[in-house]
């Protein structure tokens, strides 16, 4: 079987609430860390989410 080219990552809120999203990314086409603006329901605003490792 072929090895999957996608890694599981955790996108953690920069607002300091501890809220996070999980997703996958193709490690070959995007080797740099992801940074996306998404909605944080704990502060009820759109904030930046940065990539961290899943423990």
UniProtKB/Swiss-Prot annotation:
Residues 1-11 have a biased composition (Basic and acidic residues). GO terms for cellular component: cytosolic large ribosomal subunit. Gene3D superfamilies: Ribosomal protein L33 (2.20.28.120). SUPFAM superfamilies: Zn-binding ribosomal proteins (SSF57829). It comes from the Bacteria. GO terms for biological process: translation. Residues 1-27 are annotated as: Disordered. Keywords: Ribonucleoprotein, Ribosomal protein. Residues 14-24 have a biased composition (Polar residues). Pfam families: Ribosomal_L33 (PF00471). GO terms for molecular function: structural constituent of ribosome. Belongs to the bacterial ribosomal protein bL33 family. NCBIfam families: PRK00595.1 (NF001860), rpmG_bact (TIGR01023). PANTHER family: 54S RIBOSOMAL PROTEIN L39, MITOCHONDRIAL, LARGE RIBOSOMAL SUBUNIT PROTEIN BL33M. This is Large ribosomal subunit protein bL33.
């Amino acid at each position: 079987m072929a090895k999957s080219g996608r890694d599981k990552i955790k996108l953690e809120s920069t607002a300091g609430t501890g809220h996070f999203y999980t997703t996958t990314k193709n490690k070959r086409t995007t080797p740099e860390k992801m940074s996306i603006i998404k909605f944080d329901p704990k502060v009820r605003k759109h904030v930046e989410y940065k990539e961290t490792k899943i423990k």
